[in-house]
Curated annotation (Swiss-Prot):
Record-given protein name: Mechanosensitive ion channel protein 4
Gene that produces this protein: MSL4
Chief place of localization: membrane
Biological process according to GO: monoatomic ion transmembrane transport
Alphabetized InterPro entries for the sequence: LSM_dom_sf (IPR010920), MscS-like_plants/fungi (IPR016688), MscS_beta-dom_sf (IPR023408), MscS_channel_2nd (IPR006685)
Taxonomic source organism: Arabidopsis thaliana
Keyword tags: Ion channel, Ion transport, Membrane, Transmembrane, Transmembrane helix, Transport
Cellular localisation: Membrane
């Protein structure tokens, strides 16, 4: 029920949670109908309260006032509702003039969040925030206070707002929290967060202190050190990959408690073995008709066999590391399977010792079958470890080859893009080099004149900075001028000491010479790092560098970063960035390669603001999609590993049964019958899993973020799993496809397609002069040739068809300088071309309209009066007259 009066309008000010909760006696807890009665008492009768009701505060003043006309109407309506026994409801609309006064203060953010803290907020602002539909509520109690008379003074106005018509509502915190969680749950990973109110990249700044999450931290905590990959000049390095193929954590030997215990037992058992062989009394001692020293050797192998096998593994690893080719290709897998190999050697030593110490003679003397079963158990354990070793090696080899063949090119391009963004957002290197030479010349001048200067620290003569991709800052290290920048992933303090990847090494890598360690490090840079920019000034301290580094985590921040880069690189007042501007930040080869990244820059040799903005935004999208792809692939590999573990465990169990002799004919008959039942129940599921694995790892037709077309519907890949793939349709509806079903469907991938064509068709009249059509064709070709950043030159334009004898269809097939992954950009360029074609047709006076048709009348009826029942009689009379 909306309150409105043509004679007089009253202001209804509603305050939510705005009153002190200490005065509980001021709240009305009884039926809301009785509130409208002229009750003189300030305390409400009764004290029971209902959790599902609205609690409205009464007027603080006990002085009764004459209700105004709107209040009388409300009173009459509520009394009628009470008499009829119907449910009472109050409708307050957003267009009520009582709720649209300018005197109402704005709504605070705390009130909208649904918290129960005392916050003053009007209902008017809640309408603006989209909560107007929550105003209409049907409850058992609704209590309103009469309106307040108009006041002239400011004090009266303040008192009127604070003490008169105030509504205290209990906020539903759990409902709003549930809505927020549902919104976060259904949000796509490929969609940006809401654009911040203030255009500042605050979300990308990392605080000075606190624990850093490796997935979100923006910097490497330790600067470059002389023993990193970029510490020496390229000419001085005989093996550029010698220090990078082996992680620092594997070089350090970890000493655990078990190793210490093994060393202690090794010393004690060797001492007891020497005593049993030297002392005559112990030399003749036997246990179960077996010499004492044999038992000691058996215990030594059981307890200290892992220690001895670890020595053998370390010796093998040392020989692998000494060979360059083996180190690049084999070392990663050697470190991955060194534990299973160590267990194999240990069990092999135990089996050899058991076989040669407890020979057939001892077995005949003891007349027991226990030794035979112990031997079989040892053989079973050794076979199980060997099979597990083969399984681990195969999974690692297949996963490494899959990542290397599928994602290496994208990772290399993404890291170079990140390097370009960070370098262009920092200070010019040529200026740093000139400043360093100036400082060095000044130092030499002072030394010549005889002044003794204190040794310069790293801050006095700084070396050219090292760019750490993902770290978000330029790192300074005490190396010489001309050193190649270093790329490393962002990580926590625990992972911050990991060495980086030099940019020149990155450019020389390919799928043939990259090692598995290097590929794993590149993947970590993508998965745990983010695009970042640098402010123009580089500070000396690490904390100041941390505050200056800014990460790009949304397309909005990417646009801000592009604007900062343009202001940093372009000359003051210039509208474009030229090759000379790039040369101030990058080398000549890097500048040429960077120019090729921009659309149309290789032809016109300049970059506009819009082109730079689109490039940074596309780089952010590509980086986000690649990181999500690698994460999903890692999850899929882990799940595949678990599936293979189950299958291998079943195979090992069957082999154990065969070795132990348990698998008799009757046993196999029972197992086969049960196996048939299992195949009947789970056969289809196993087939589906196998087809899904083949689809994900062998076919692999798309990655996360790719635009695909399946059954005529264009969709974006949202998430990839072992069994299913989640797509986003054009209206952001999530569609889940089983991978086994996708394997049987043709899939069109726009992202992996080359530059794609477009088709434009339009009609002209057949009577259009040929001169106009020729001029139209030439002007269209001229327009396309001038748009070098959008279209390939010389598109095909032909007269394709003729519709009767009235019009001619002209078809045009221009080729974009991109594929249709970004469908919005495709239609923008197509729309601009259509607008140009329409403008050219108007200029050339080319129109399509039907000419008048000639109608030939062969005969007319005789000139006799026409009599018809459908014509009024008065018309016939007028004709006869």
């Amino acid at each position: 029920m909306a309150v409105d009066s043509t004679d007089q309008r009253r202001d209804f000010v509603v305050r939510i949670d705005g009153e002190d909760n200490g005065d509980s006696e001021k709240f009305w807890r009884e039926s809301s109908i009785n509130f409208w009665h002229n009750d003189k008492s300030s305390k409400p009768p009764g004290g029971e309260e209902d959790d599902g009701s609205f609690d409205f505060m009464r007027r603080s003043s006990e002085k009764s006032e004459e209700p105004d006309p709107p209040s009388k109407l409300i009173n009459q309506f509520l009394n009628k509702q009470k008499a009829s026994g119907d449910e009472i409801s109050l409708d307050m609309e957003a267009n009520m003039p009582e709720l649209q006064k300018n005197t109402v203060p704005p709504l605070s953010s705390t009130a909208v969040s649904g918290s129960a803290s005392p916050v003053t907020a009007p209902v008017t602002a809640s309408y603006r925030n989209g909560t107007g539909d929550a105003i209409r509520r049907r409850q058992n109690r609704v209590t309103l206070s009469p309106s307040v008379k108009d006041g002239d003074s400011s004090e009266d106005e303040e008192n009127r707002v604070d003490g008169s018509e105030v509504v205290k509502c209990t906020s539903n915190r759990s409902t709003m929290r549930t809505k927020t969680l549902m919104k976060m749950k259904t949000r796509s990973r490929l969609m940006d967060p809401p654009t911040p109110t203030y255009p500042d990249m605050v979300s990308g700044r990392t605080p000075r202190s606190g624990n850093l999450n490796p997935g979100f931290s923006g910097r490497n905590t330790k600067p470059g050190t002389p023993n990193q990959g970029g510490s020496k000049d390229l000419e001085e390095e005989e093996d550029p990959f010698s220090e990078e193929d082996l992680p620092e954590g594997l070089r350090k030997e970890k000493i655990c408690v078990w190793v210490i215990i093994e060393w202690i037992f090794l010393i004690l058992i060797i001492a007891s073995l020497i005593c049993s062989l030297v002392i005559p009394y112990l030399r003749g001692k036997t246990l179960w008709d077996l010499a004492l020293w044999k038992w000691e050797v058996m215990v030594l192998v059981l307890i200290c066999g892992r220690l001895v096998s670890s020595w053998i593994v370390k010796l093998f690893v040392y020989f692998v590391e000494s060979n360059f080719l083996w180190r690049k290709k084999v070392l990663y897998f050697v470190y991955g399977i060194r534990k299973p190999v160590q267990n194999c050697l240990w069990l092999g030593l135990v089996l050899i010792a058991w076989h040669f110490l407890f020979d057939k003679k001892v077995e005949r003397e003891m007349r027991s079958t226990v030794l035979k079963y112990v031997t079989k158990v040892l053989i079973c354990l050794l076979v199980a470890v060997i099979i597990w070793l083969i399984k681990t090696l195969l999974v690692k080899v297949l996963a490494s080859s899959f990542h290397m063949s599928t994602y290496f090119d994208r990772i290399q391009e993404s890291l170079f893009t990140q390097y370009v963004i960070e370098t262009l957002s920092g200070p010019p290197r040529i200026e740093i080099h000139i400043e360093e030479e100036k400082v060095a010349n000044d130092v030499k001048t002072f030394e010549i004149v005889g002044r003794k200067l204190s040794p310069l620290g790293p801050k006095a003569v700084s070396s050219p900075p090292q760019v750490t991709v993902g770290s978000g800052r330029l790192q300074k290290s005490p190396s010489r001028v001309g050193k190649s920048p270093v790329l490393s992933r962002s990580g926590s303090k625990k992972e911050g000491g990991e060495e980086g990847i030099r940019i020149d090494h990155l450019q020389r890598m390919n799928t043939k010479n990259v090692s598995a360690w290097k590929m794993k490090k590149l993947m970590n840079v993508i998965k745990k790092g983010t695009l970042s920019t640098l402010d123009e000034q580089i500070q000396d301290t690490t904390t100041q560098e941390d505050d200056k580094a800014t990460q790009i985590r949304s397309e909005f921040e990417a646009k801000l970063a592009a604007r900062k880069i343009f202001q940093n690189v372009a000359e003051p007042g210039s509208r474009y960035i030229y090759m000379e501007d790039f040369m101030r930040f990058l080398s000549e080869d890097e500048s040429e390669r960077a120019m090729d990244l921009f659309e149309g820059a290789s032809e016109c040799h300049k970059i506009s603001k819009s082109c730079l903005k689109n490039w940074v935004v596309n780089a952010f999208r590509e980086r986000r999609a690649l990181a999500l792809t690698l994460n999903d692939t890692k999850t899929a590999v882990n799940r595949l590993h678990r599936i293979v573990d189950v299958l291998v465990s079943i195979v090992i169990l069957i082999i154990w049964l065969l070795i132990l002799g348990i698998a008799t004919t009757k046993f196999l008959l029972v197992i086969s019958s049960q196996l048939l039942l299992v195949v009947f129940v789970f056969g289809n599921s196993c087939k589906t899993i196998f087809e899904a694995v083949i689809f994900v790892f062998v076919m692999h037709p798309f990655d996360v973020g790719d635009r695909c077309e399946i059954d005529g519907v264009q969709m974006i890949v949202e998430e990839m799993n072992i069994l299913t793939t989640v797509f986003l349709r054009f209206d952001n509806q999530k569609i889940v496809y089983p991978n086994s079903l996708l394997g049987t469907k043709p899939i069109a991938n726009y992202y992996r397609s080359p530059d794609m064509q477009d088709a434009i068709e339009f009609f002209v009249h057949i009577a259009t002069p040929p001169e106009k059509t020729t001029a139209l064709r030439q002007r269209i070709l001229s327009y396309v040739d001038n748009k070098k950043d959008h279209w390939h030159p010389s598109p095909m334009i032909v007269f394709r068809d003729m519709c009767g004898l009235n019009s001619v269809k002209i078809a045009m097939w221009p080729t974009h300088k991109m594929n249709h992954q970004n469908m919005g950009e495709r239609y923008v360029r197509r729309g601009q071309l259509l607008e140009e074609i329409g403008r050219l047709c108007r200029e050339l006076d080319i129109e399509y309209r039907l000419y008048p048709l000639n109608i030939n009348v062969k005969s007319l009826p005789a000139a006799t009066p026409i009599t018809s029942d459908r014509i009024p009689p008065s018309w016939n009379q007028q004709r006869s007259v």
